[in-house]
């Protein structure tokens, strides 16, 4: 049954590259076969409940700009929000969604009331998933918005806050499991510090390690088959976050013996904030064996903060999905649009148009990446660049020869290497041919 929020808008369909219909896909064709698999199964698109239905359009200098009928802290409003959200999911045709607990339920007076509200909404979600075929990519807990978390959740100096946060995560994992969620995400929005003057760094890292260990232990205890994911971000809202980037998260996981239990959910905007390219973070996660899922958005490259805009740069998407394909593609992960409308984009159809454009951009990037992979456009030059290591001397350097033996061979054979071109411009031109 329609809520009426989206008026007479019909289900979004693929119309091909020549279409000028803003409410149709031009490049995303769910059933198109790419590298032997349906495009939908490659991309595994998800809608973010928080930016799409909970964000009010505020910024640091101004309040709410969106006028939505569900904007109140009442359970009936939360139910209306669920109706509108699932209507949107059906119109768009993305197969997955994601949520924080605080996105979907009212804020209660205490933990028990929060849990009751969450369970009431999960009852509704179960029915709607059965009716629509929608699936949950991942669930998570909001451990950063409420003032109790102003000094962190897992890293809070108050053990009562740690306990409240842990109990909240337990209920959110339960909800995620019940809804068939394929992952559970932890984003440490306030797991960091503003100043070292009031921060015990060693204690806070140990507490965060303990918290994550409890999550992993509970996952196995209840038989949750999904993947536990950490989402790196360098700062904002804190000055310095402990899950700064992929490399930092991997070091943290190794320190606490969790590198085989936890993977990463990499957001493009967070990679940019950390001073990296998106493909760098994806490539490093793949190399370290912790690649899990992605949050797809972009930042404004001039503003210096997290703007969470829909992707619109096909070359960037091509290089990103090239790394995803090199990793073997998604298993439990997917492409979650952690992107929000601009605060002046007030119309309901703007929400559809933003997602349609993002999905088309990702589809173009995926197809370009697949062609580069099939043609060996980047892999062949890379193999040539490192070919020397496949020879007898290269293999001996990596196993068998000691430092003094290497020095002896260099002198005896008069090894005097000459530099070779890295051919960067050539490779960049190759990428541009595909996009």
Swiss-Prot record:
* GO molecular function terms listed in the Swiss-Prot or TrEMBL record: magnesium ion binding; xylose isomerase activity
Which residues are Mg(2+) 2-binding?
267, 270, 306, 308
Question: Where does it reside?
Answer: Cytoplasm
Grouped into one coarse class, the protein's main location is cytoplasm
> What does the record list as coiled-coil region(s)?
none
Which co-factors does it depend on? Mg(2+)
GO annotations of cellular component type: cytoplasm
- What note does UniProt attach to the cofactor annotation? Binds 2 magnesium ions per subunit.
Question: What top-level class of enzyme does the UniProt entry assign?
Answer: isomerase
One GO biological process from the UniProt record? D-xylose metabolic process
Which reaction(s) does its UniProt entry say it catalyses? alpha-D-xylose = alpha-D-xylulofuranose
Entry EC no(s): 5.3.1.5
UniProt superkingdom: Bacteria
Where along the chain is the active site annotated?
Answer: 100, 103
Q: Could you tell me which SUPFAM superfamilies the record lists for this protein?
A: Xylose isomerase-like (SSF51658)
Family statement: Belongs to the xylose isomerase family.
Q: Tell me the NCBIfam families matching this sequence.
A: PRK05474.1, xylose_isom_A
Subunit composition? Answer: Homotetramer.
> What name appears for this protein in its UniProt entry?
Xylose isomerase
Gene name on record? xylA
